[in-house]
Amino acid sequence: MKKIGVILSGCGVYDGSEIHEAVLTLLAISRSGAQAVCFAPDKQQVDVINHLTGEAMTETRNVLIEAARITRGEIRPL
């Protein structure tokens, strides 16, 4: 089976990979008969955004851990 690498960067339209775009990309790869292999940088996000207000937050999040939300844990560090 052909494998296609997908690089994600966090999870969220303002501070990471846009969820709809990522999921539809993974679906298209699957429907084409290939296997998606997902990767993300294992580092802290530069900015964390409150998606309800659009304002920056002071907390920190890891890019790899946030991207794992989209892939349900099936992701490798870059």
Where are these regions (language model features)?
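Extended, subdomain-level signal for the structured scaffold at the beginning of enzyme domains
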Residues: 1-78
